[in-house]
Curated annotation (Swiss-Prot):
The gene is NHL3. Its main location: membrane. GO terms for biological process: cellular response to hypoxia; defense response to bacterium; defense response to virus; response to bacterium; response to salicylic acid; response to wounding. Induction: Accumulates upon infection with avirulent Pseudomonas syringae pv. tomato DC3000 (Pst DC3000) carrying avirulence genes avrRpm1, avrRpt2, avrB, or avrRps4 but not with the virulent Pst DC3000. Induced by salicylic acid (SA). Accumulates rapidly in local and systemic tissues after wounding. Triggered by spermine, an inducer of pathogenesis-related (PR) genes. Up-regulated by cucumber mosaic virus (CMV-Y and CMV-B2 strains). It holds the Pfam family LEA_2. Glycosylated. Glycans are attached at N102, N135, N145, N215. GO terms for molecular function: mRNA binding. This is NDR1/HIN1-like protein 3. InterPro entries: LEA_2, NDR1-like. May form oligomers or be a component of larger protein complex in plasma membranes. One of its GO terms (cellular component) is plasmodesma. It is found in: Cell membrane.
Length: 231
């Protein structure tokens, strides 16, 4: 056996080959679009998120530009006249009512029109609803325009007044001046030039004091009343 501790004069021994070990994808990024399929959907979610952010920013910019161009002002509602010919609560809690209402709707905008697709009027005494009307026809209101609409609430309704509401009613019966709320539910769209907006549903509330017309001795005359508009 040759002496292993002796010198070796043969050909040089090549260095050992490096073995590479795959440890999967490095880093938190997902690379190009072709790598997205193997990225457990993270790339797709990132793209969708970026698209949504871009759309939101563009919509915000568009809304700002529209506002700067058109400078929208709030629509104004007034009850110009109210006529109450009956408002009687019988012992069985049936309320008989007959109320005529006239409204003015003012569009103060110079460049914005309004489509009134639906107007529903409800009558309330305290928190109790006693009547509803949706017989106002839909219409378009142009720039800087005032429109007069009217409706009638008539019929009978079971109402269950609490102690405070019954006390208020007794006071109103004695004075013959009734504290009635008219609430409007609208479906409207705005027109900006050739562009029509999506549908809005503002709520209108009018706090009224209406004299009973059969009583001519109170001397109280209905006063036109501005309504609160809540978009």
């Amino acid at each position: 056996m040759a002496d292993l501790n002796g010198a070796y004069y043969g050909p040089s021994i090549p260095p050992p080959k490096k073995v590479s070990h795959s440890h999967g994808r490095r880093g938190g990024g997902c690379g190009c679009l072709g790598d997205c399929l193997g990225c457990c959907g993270c790339c797709i979610l990132s793209v969708i998120f970026n698209i949504l952010i871009t759309i939101a920013v563009l919509l915000g910019i568009a809304a700002l530009i529209i506002w700067l161009i058109f400078r929208p002002n709030a629509i104004k509602f007034h009850v110009t006249d109210a006529k109450l010919t009956e408002f009687t609560l019988d012992p069985t809690n049936n309320l008989r009512y007959n109320l005529d209402l006239n409204f003015t709707i003012r569009n103060p905008n110079r460049r914005i029109g309004v489509y009134y697709d639906e107007i529903e009027v409800r009558g309330y005494y305290g928190d109790q609803r006693f009547g509803m009307s949706n017989n106002i026809s839909k219409f378009y209101q142009g720039h800087k325009n005032t429109t007069v609409v009217g409706t009638k609430l008539v019929g009978q309704q079971l109402v269950l007044l609490d102690g405070g509401e019954r006390k208020d009613l007794n006071e109103d019966v004695n004075s013959q001046i009734y504290r009635i709320d008219a609430k409007l539910r609208l479906k409207i769209r705005f027109k900006f030039g050739l562009i029509k907006s999506w549908r809005f549903k503002p709520k209108i509330k009018c706090d009224l004091k209406v004299p009973l017309t059969s009583n001519s001795t109170s001397g109280f005359v209905f006063q036109p009343t501005k309504c609160d508009v809540d978009f």
